[in-house]
């Protein structure tokens, strides 16, 4: 059974919320305390890689159009590369804070893919509105990991990066395929 698009979006939202809460928890208690147990340091990269695998599964089932297939494949590949780099950083294989440029690039490319794959205008439907909102959000929030690469000690960059995934989850949870844009004020009128 292939889930409906909104159910796949809700699953992605749950995973994005998990990733965001992991990053917020690490931000609150500090990296030293959070990573005292080795397994906790691997949670974020593992969740990102798991999201990549799920995106590849969705790519297989997104037979709506070639554009949807390519967009999901780009998101899956961006998540896989970002997760792999984060895993290498956690394991000590990579050391430079400049590797934070990879998640910045992944967020930017994902945002552009969101914008390109939505063929309808902002106010066509709730789904179109959310795709545009998520796309522009991802393009803008790519500045957080970029700032983290340039100034790794500033907390604002880590906080922004963590809250990016929480906001992404909120937007994805709002997705309903056949819903009007703003509650009862849709194409059917008030």
Q: What residue spans do the PLM features occupy?
A:
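Hydrophobic transmembrane alpha-helical segments in integral membrane proteins
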Residues: 1-17
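Hydrophobic cores of alpha-helical transmembrane segments in multi-pass inner/ER membrane proteins
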Residues: 12-24, 48, 74-89, 134-147
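Membrane-interfacial loop-to-transmembrane alpha-helix junctions, especially the N-terminal start
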Residues: 32-48, 95-105, 153-163
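A generic, lipid-embedded transmembrane alpha helix
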Residues: 43-61
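Juxtamembrane "helix-exit" motif on the non-cytosolic side of transmembrane helices
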Residues: 55-64, 114-123, 175-179
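Non-cytosolic membrane-interface motifs at loop->transmembrane helix junctions
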Residues: 64-73, 122-133
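Alpha-helical membrane segments in multi-pass integral membrane proteins
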Residues: 98-117, 126-147, 158-171
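Juxtamembrane boundary at the C-terminal end of a transmembrane helix
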Residues: 171-190
